[in-house]
Amino acid sequence: GAGVSGLYLLRGMAGRGEDGVLTSIDIEPEFHRAARTAFSEAGFQAGRSRLILGRAVDVLPRLTAGGYDLVFVDAAKAEYAHYFEQGVQLLRPGGVIAFNDVLSKGKPVDPVRRDTEAMALREVARAVAGDERLMPTLLPVGGGLLAAARLEV
């Protein structure tokens, strides 16, 4: 549901004594309302989250470069490659960019598949693996998580 990933991230920050702010971008107003309600019901102050209504491709370039510890991408898979470079630009050294649901039935996408989603997932995997600024890993949890830490450069 709306806000589930955000709740986990907020709980993780609170569990470590972090006072960070969760920034979430979504184009759907009802998802924002649901997330805000979920965060409030879980006991998080309104100032712990910043919900931005808009298309991520329009919003990401306006965010502070080098100002984020984590960029979590959970969007239409066909758009993942569009978010890659913008997401990396937002990371502090040591920060992590993570792409959700990158596996197909627990395995990398079949190279024979030529549909838009499969091609987009392969494209972002190649981009992450080939980027010298990053140290990538593929975690077979849930639908698969492609994560990469930004190196100190």
Language-model features, listed with the residues they occupy:
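S-adenosylmethionine/decaboxylated-SAM
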Residues: G1-V153
